[in-house]
Amino acid sequence: MNQKIWDLYAPVYEKAMRLDRRYYQYMYDRIPAQISGKEVLEIATGPGLLAKHVAHPTKRMVATDYSEGMIREAKKGSYPAQLTFAVADATTLPYPADSFDVVLIANALHVMPEPELALAEINRVLRTGGLLIAPNFVGHGTGILSRICSKLLRLAGIRFEHQWTESEYLHWLQTHGWDVTFSKLLPSRIPLLYTECVRSYAWTEEEMCDIMTPTNRNL
């Protein structure tokens, strides 16, 4: 999706998220225990709302977004000292291999044309035994409210490249090398599937190249 769209919506994005605050509260309550004492990378942080709520027990947390406008918004206000914000593209992360214990990417994979590229980078920077937390919208258009919200977002220029159902999203993660250890469906305006994953096994470079071939990208 065009970076300029996210720059445009950066000043109002947090206000829109507040409409689903009670469902985000579930993540605010659960995630800190999963990342306590860990080095954490967040991808697609947006205005940093999730990062600011969960970073306090971490050893270090880096929250990134490829929109400079979003990062400018994220840096406003107060947040834990161990939290930093940076501009970074999820498909070409500027971090060495095995840099983080946990990677968090919330509500972003479905708007990426090739989310497999982001998964490959997550696989690269995540340490052995690390955790991927990947909540994502599922079931677009399955209910009246969901259909209305999806249509409004499309009119605003925010396009869903992938419209997974709950089972399709879980299958997609599995076919790309991740075992889902925990999931919970949250009935927000567009249903949100909270997921925690670990690698199904250590992928070799050859296997990662195979997973990235065009014929396999939409599995």
Name what the model sees in each region.
Residues 1-35, 49, 53, 73, ...:
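Conserved class I S-adenosyl-L-methionine
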Residues 16, 20, 133-193:
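C-terminal alpha-helical "lid/dimerization" subdomain adjacent to the S-adenosyl-L-methionine
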Residues 38, 59, 101:
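Conserved acidic residues
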Residues 41, 45-92:
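Class I SAM-dependent methyltransferase SAM/SAH-binding core
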Residues 91-102:
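A short acidic, Gly/Pro-enriched loop at the edge of an enzyme's catalytic core
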Residues 102-114:
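A short SAM/SAH-binding and catalytic strip from SAM-dependent methyltransferases
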Residues 116-128:
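A short glycine-rich, Lys/Arg-flanked "PGG" loop and its adjoining helix->strand segment in the class I
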Residues 176-178, 182-219:
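Core SAM-dependent methyltransferase catalytic element
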